[in-house]
Amino acid sequence: MWRAVAASGEILPVGALLGVMTQSEISDDEIDSFVTEFQENFVPEEVSEEDQGIELQYVEIDGMKLSYVKQGDGEQVAVLLHGFGGDLNNWLFNQSVLAEKRTVYAFDLPGHGSSTKRIGDSSLESIAEALYQAIRTLQVDGADWVGHSMGGALVLQIANAHPDCVNSMTLIGSAGLGDEINVPYLEGFVNSQSRRELKPHVEQLFNDTSLVNRQLLEDLLKFKRIDGVKDVLNDVLSGFVSDGKQAARWTEVVEKDNSRVLVIWGAEDKILPAQHARNLPGHIETHILDSYGHMVQMEAASEVNQLIVDFWSS
């Protein structure tokens, strides 16, 4: 279960409590007690001037504003891309850890989060090109790319079109590696107009459905009600899925001998089956994590973070 403590958009000092994730058997009273004790005893860390104020920034590409958060100041660079219908907060439990020894950018995809909602060409190829141009505008020549779900397909497309920009790929529950995809989930997510309608679809993202609480559903509905969002989601979906299957596969990209690829999957993924990971050639480093679902980077954040850090340092 996820209990938000910080308000959306609130600026907090390093080390402050954003929220609490617990097992479903933990009572509300126990959570309240923990939060109260933490807040009473919390002393903000002293941070250097350059580390203060992690804030949303924007880069403009062909008339589109893409929002991103930058953390870390290492010489090496990583880029995090979320999936369909998500936003950069999908990396809430990952970005700061991954940024301990490098500079890490987490983007809102075009049409998502705080990025421009009306994007013209909504094909994966066009979205991937916009993200590549964004990184080049930020004067990044090469990066370690991390993609979740549709974000993984975008990483594969970028690697296919601009291999010199991709030092490595980490693909988490990635699209683009098989035919099967849960189309009823995608359509239900786009078309749901209330918490009651949306909840059963969002629950498919997690193995622990107690993580799907009222606040999460309200935040998703607020996003979906923004002018232009439903249209852009439908447009992206139409280019992403065809005849009940994924419209494109990029398995040949990960199978190249010179590709550095890490694949992570939740064994209980109900959106993109873990069999896609099992079907990959044996030389690709693959980890299928038991008891976790499609949002494995949130449900098993510590384990996923360690796998990525170890992969980068290998």
Question: In which residue ranges do the predicted regions lie?
Answer:
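Mobile cofactor-carrier "swinging-arm" domains
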Residues: 1-54
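Active-site loop/oxyanion-hole signature of alpha/beta-hydrolase fold enzymes
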Residues: 57, 61, 105-150, 154, ...
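Conserved HGGG/HGGXW glycine-rich cap/lid loop of the alpha/beta-hydrolase fold
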Residues: 64, 70-114
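Flexible "cap/lid" loop of the alpha/beta hydrolase fold
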Residues: 156-160, 167-198
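Conserved alpha/beta-hydrolase catalytic His-Asp/Glu region
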Residues: 192-256
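Short beta-strand/loop motif that positions the catalytic acidic residue
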Residues: 257, 263-265
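Acidic catalytic loop of the alpha/beta-hydrolase fold
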Residues: 267-272
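Catalytic histidine-centered segment of alpha/beta-hydrolase-like enzymes
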Residues: 292-305
